[in-house]
A protein has these predicted regions:
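N-terminal, intrinsically disordered, polar/charged segments of Gram-positive cell-envelope systems
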Residues: 2, 30-115
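A eukaryote-biased signal for long
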Residues: 14-17, 73-78, 239
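Structured segments of extracytoplasmic/periplasmic soluble domains
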Residues: 108-116, 142-146, 198, 202-206
Length: 276
């Protein structure tokens, strides 16, 4: 069990370290993790790494209903171009949110957490019924303000429960226009106070945890493209954990992984170990 605990800790740290680029390939990340786990388990078997591709349909959502607001939710409607991602798409079931509903839920999370206005944005959606390392059906959104998508594009991404719309993770990815060191900063492991305070402020501002915050702990460091990152864990008095990522270059908030997402991943790993 000691070996597994070490492995799980490393995988969770890897998840946090690569969090800033999860939106560029959420499904690819989980698929790669499955390949690694299968190799580590000594199994010679195929695991899902690709998904069916269907034709891309594109539509622009209506701007207004009454007084510029949606009649049911009261939220302001905006124009953004919505497409099913041609690179990766599954087939949602009757109980899943539609692509349009999932996109609206994602847009609300982006407004609430990043204060992002999607007017004029391009939103690419992907549906996945779940993977070995994340066995929950989910919708993933990739949001840009340019039609062409490249690894260097500035983007906001999210992953939500396909049925309930609950947030699993959300992130912001950018390419810096300056060259900065990407190496490990040992001092931050002992003192990440500036990031801990930023995490506390964001958690309280967005009411991300039910109840009070118990403590904030250093998690790991990494980088996304040419942007050095640091992740910290915000731990609530009820045991809830939110993993947050920031830029080590200018302390910009880069996103978060929710407690539900963490529990889904850990449960999947526990089940995999139990089958060994």
């Amino acid at each position: 069990m000691k070996n597994f605990n070490t492995k799980r800790k490393n995988i969770l740290k890897l998840t946090a370290a690569t969090f800033a680029i999860i939106g560029v390939g959420t499904i690819l990340f989980h698929s790669a993790a499955e390949v690694v786990l299968a190799a580590n388990n000594g199994k010679v078997e195929k695991v899902p790494t690709t998904y069916q591709v269907s034709g891309s349909s594109e539509t622009t959502l209506p701007k207004v209903t009454e007084n510029g607001k949606d009649k049911e939710s009261g939220s302001v409607k905006v124009n953004y171009t919505l497409s099913m991602d041609s690179m990766n798409t599954g087939t949602p079931t009757d109980t899943d949110l539609t692509m349009e509903e999932a996109a609206e839920a994602g847009a609300q999370y982006l407004r609430d957490i990043f204060v992002l206005d999607l007017e004029g944005a391009y939103v690419y959606m992907s549906y996945n019924p779940g993977t070995v390392t994340f066995p929950r059906a989910f919708w993933a959104g990739d949001v840009l303000f340019q039609k062409e998508r490249t690894p260097e594009s500035t983007r906001w991404t999210y992953m939500i429960d396909a049925v309930t719309g609950e947030l699993f993770n959300i992130s912001y990815d950018r390419q810096l226009d300056v060259s900065v060191p990407l190496g490990y900063d040992a001092a931050l492991e002992d003192d990440c106070g500036i990031y801990a305070q930023s995490a506390r402020n964001k958690t309280e501002e967005c009411k991300l945890i039910d109840g009070s915050i118990d403590r904030i702990e250093y998690n790991c460091q990494g980088y996304s493209g040419n942007d050095p990152t640091i992740s910290v864990d915000v731990i609530g008095g009820n045991g809830e954990i939110i993993n947050m990522s920031f830029s080590r270059y200018d302390q910009t908030f880069l996103g978060l992984i929710t407690d539900t997402s963490r529990k889904v991943t850990e449960s999947a790993l526990d089940n995999m170990v139990g089958e060994m």
